[in-house]
Regions:
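Conserved glycine-rich Rossmann-like NAD(P)H-binding loop of the short-chain dehydrogenase/reductase
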Residues: 19-36
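Conserved glycine-rich cofactor-binding loop
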Residues: 5-7
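C-terminal helical subdomain
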Residues: 172, 179-180, 187, 195-237
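Substrate-binding pocket helix/loop in short-chain dehydrogenase/reductase
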Residues: 89-90, 94-99
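Active-site helix of classical SDR
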Residues: 113, 155
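Residue(s) in the substrate-gating loop at a strand-loop-helix junction
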Residues: 139
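Active-site loop immediately N-terminal to the catalytic Tyr-X3-Lys motif
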Residues: 91, 144-150, 201
Length: 239
């Protein structure tokens, strides 16, 4: 899984480890990733293999899949957790930040799925009663426009569409994909909005973690393309 050193990704890694999964975790910052791996290993008692990778470098993304395949030879769950976002009005968004968000949030996810699909299909064929899953951390901004998040929302819409394509092409083979699309979750990535939304009013990391775990327990006969999670209140379509 990518984006495993912090926030929702780290929470999902911890929960899957406790559920008995052997983990290959990835993040860009090696020191933070190693700390996460040591913590996860202590908590879960299972195998945790850290692979530092820059999601903007295709060779790193490909190397991550190869490293997992060489170590385990199977892939039950691929979690697309790496992501980056910037808040800015559409007219003031730089091309550099546009490119970075699409490189990390969309291109890297596409390459990961493309590289991992043969292994996912192989795993699903070996255990047809369970199949294999792709879980993508998307956003409600991929479904409903949010001011100042035009590019971020566009990348998440692409991620949602990627999951739908996986289902259209691979669900008959036992491989299904689910995009989890929450509003603001109480993590360090949402610190910039806490002057408007109190953390106590945000979605909890554990809420998303439990949804991800539930998806892993579904049979291949149940395909869930996306899950939308909103905060309480009257404007349920807003992040």
């Amino acid at each position: 899984m990518t984006g495993a050193s912090r926030g929702i990704g780290r929470g999902i890694a911890r929960r899957l480890g406790k559920a008995g999964y052997d983990l290959t975790i990835s993040a860009r910052e090696g020191t933070r990733l190693q700390q996460a791996a040591e913590e996860l290993s202590d908590i879960t008692g299972g195998s945790v293999h850290p692979v530092a990778a820059d999601m903007t470098a295709e060779k790193d993304v490909s190397r991550l899949v190869r490293a997992h395949d060489e170590r385990h030879g199977r892939l039950d769950v691929l979690v697309l957790g790496a992501g980056v976002g910037f808040s800015a009005p559409l007219a003031q968004t730089s091309k550099r930040r546009y490119d970075l968000q699409f490189d990390v949030n969309v291109r890297a996810a596409f390459v990961l799925v493309q590289e991992a699909l043969p292994l996912l299909r192989k795993t699903a064929a070996g255990r047809p009663e369970h199949g294999a899953k792709v879980i993508a951390l998307a956003s409600i901004t991929g479904l409903f426009a949010e001011p100042d998040l035009a590019v971020y929302g566009a990348t998440k819409a692409a991620l949602i569409s990627l999951c739908q394509s996986v289902n259209a092409e691979a669900s008959d083979d036992g491989v299904s994909a689910t995009a989890i699309c929450p509003g603001y979750v109480d993590t360090d990535m949402t610190a910039w909005v806490r002057d408007r939304i109190e953390p106590r009013r945000m979605i909890r990391v554990d809420d998303i973690v439990e949804m991800a775990l539930a998806v892993t327990k579904l049979s291949p006969c149940a395909v869930v393309p996306d899950i939308t999670v909103t905060r309480p209140g009257r404007q349920l379509g807003r992040a």
